[in-house]
């Protein structure tokens, strides 16, 4: 029996259970912008990704997609570009994609749990980390790492899932209502996310956070070329379909 019937999880979380399609959503620089991601989320390809746990025999099913904004690096010392990352200790949660990206930047991946990240930044265990903008601010990371570089390496794709156990107890009408509510929520998230993020970014800028814009993503993409090919070559055709959905 399960204690939770539904959850909102990062799409990447499913890769621990063998969901390889979901992994593609977390590859650096897959989505050029939000419109690119929503083209995917609203496409005929999205249900294939959402249904992957079912195909693998996992006891959960995907309902809809959302996103929590692009993820950016933030550091204790000011950085103005990619060259400044050489030798930095950057916090990772120990997934191979993130490790490979950090190594590609010339930095060293350092595993620290999220709960310990604030003190790790404060005490110099790590020199920086990465999060979506809203998480960066709400966890008070600017207090200890006041430099935010808007590289936007990945878009934080999230999805709602429901257990087979809970789904099986619903009538067909109730199941249809949940899927309909999911579609509405997905559309609401698309409208809300960017507006909310821009507001937080303005607050950060006006409170003295050193926000660095990245006008040219090419050097970043180049630095990630190895980790991108290593993690997409087994699904090259599917990955290309994702890339081709750009707005």
What residue spans do the PLM features occupy?
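Short beta-strand-centered segments that line the small-molecule binding cleft or hinge
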Residues: 39
């Amino acid at each position: 029996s399960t204690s939770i019937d539904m959850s909102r999880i990062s799409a990447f979380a499913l890769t621990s259970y063998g969901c390889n399609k979901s992994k593609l959503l977390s590859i650096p620089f897959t989505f050029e912008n939000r419109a690119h991601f929503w083209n995917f989320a609203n496409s005929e390809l999205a249900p294939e990704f959402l249904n992957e746990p079912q195909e693998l025999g996992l006891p959960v099913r995907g309902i809809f997609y959302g996103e929590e904004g692009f993820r950016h690096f933030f550091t204790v010392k000011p950085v103005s570009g990619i060259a400044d990352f050489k030798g930095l200790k950057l916090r990772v949660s120990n997934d191979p994609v993130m490790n490979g990206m950090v190594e590609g930047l010339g930095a060293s991946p350092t595993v620290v749990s999220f709960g310990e990240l604030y003190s790790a930044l404060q005490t110099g265990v790590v020199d920086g980390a990465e999060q979506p903008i809203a998480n960066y601010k709400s966890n008070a990371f600017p207090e200890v790492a006041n430099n935010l570089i808007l590289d936007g390496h990945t878009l934080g794709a999230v999805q709602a899932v429901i257990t087979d156990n809970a789904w099986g107890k619903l009538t067909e009408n109730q199941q249809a209502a949940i899927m309909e509510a999911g579609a509405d929520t997905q559309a609401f998230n698309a409208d809300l996310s960017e507006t909310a993020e821009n507001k937080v970014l303005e607050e950060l800028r006006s409170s003295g956070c050193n926000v660095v814009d990245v006008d040219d993503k090419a050097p970043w993409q180049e630095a990630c070329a190895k980790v991108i090919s290593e993690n997409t070559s087994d699904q090259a055709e599917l990955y290309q379909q994702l890339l081709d959905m750009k707005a």
